[in-house]
Amino acid sequence: MSNTGKLTPSKGLAITYLVRLSIGSPSGGRSEIENLNVIKKIREGFFDFPYASSQAMKRALRETLKGLGYKISPIVSTSPARTVGDPIQYIDDDLFGFMEAASKKSGRAEIDKFNGIRKAVVSMTPLLSLSAFDDNVDFGSNMMGLQAGGNPMPYETEVHRGWYRVSLYIDLNRIGTDAGFITEIKENKRADDINELIKNSLDEYDFIAEVPEDKDKNLKKGYATFKRICTNELSKKERYKRAKALLDSIRFLAPSGRNTNWLIDLTPKLMAAAYVKGARTPFLESPLLDDKQKDKNVINLAAIETSKETFADGIESLVVGYREDLIEKPNVQDNAINVQKMKAAFDTIDCWLKEHFEI
């Protein structure tokens, strides 16, 4: 069975950026030693590289959205705990998805089945260190025990410093629409000839195929499922506002959870961003900093140019943003890459969003 209909490429934002930690303790891992707070790490060869999970990073985005004044979905006390699953009212349910398989909001089983599970609009990697862990530990004491007449409880916390990398893909086509917004599902359509389906109302179909007839498996008939109808999807203006809110939360990203004990800055210091069609991860593995000039924090324009050429048919627009107080000013006179200061780069991305949502 194959889809023979016309495919429309998804449009989205692909963003890879670097964070600089002077000293910090990313999301915690499992420890077999009492009173030792360890960092999550992944091993390559003989070296361990600290990271913060993508779940922790999405939590930080949620908390930042809340700090920017957006209404966040409350937690429902069930097993397992979940959000209320209302993407119309709550921006995080729209952007980060939810699973509410037993939803009975509309009373129509087929619609509730699709609306009960929403795939995340935002795909995100963990925040991964570019340098290995060097066994640095901070020592402290829990002085609360003194108030109870006991002794201070000593503890240790693994700490790290260096450059970290994270990547996101934001499916702009699905913000404010799709699962969670569905109000009607048309019945499947059949025809004696698949060509009848292809030449009639093609844009209304989600899937078109040739399938065996129930009574005679040797006889093929046309079969089509209609696109699910979202009559209560958000307006283009509201969809733009949510995309812009997510962009702002990246720009002002603040830590959550245990990282509140270590005041760190998770905002982009060097960023490669692209408005893409289909190419979701053009810079995910690209070394944005030039390894040959690590002490100077030089942008690796050659690597970015290579990714740009590799995904040329999937990248519609590209911008590189940098913090001039941390990254050496690049020489782009003879380079076709659009390099801007960080604020200007985010303004450029905002222009892409306005164009996408026709604002």
Residue ranges and their predicted role:
Residues M1-I359:
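RNA-binding basic/glycine-rich loop and surface signature characteristic of RAMP-family CRISPR effectors
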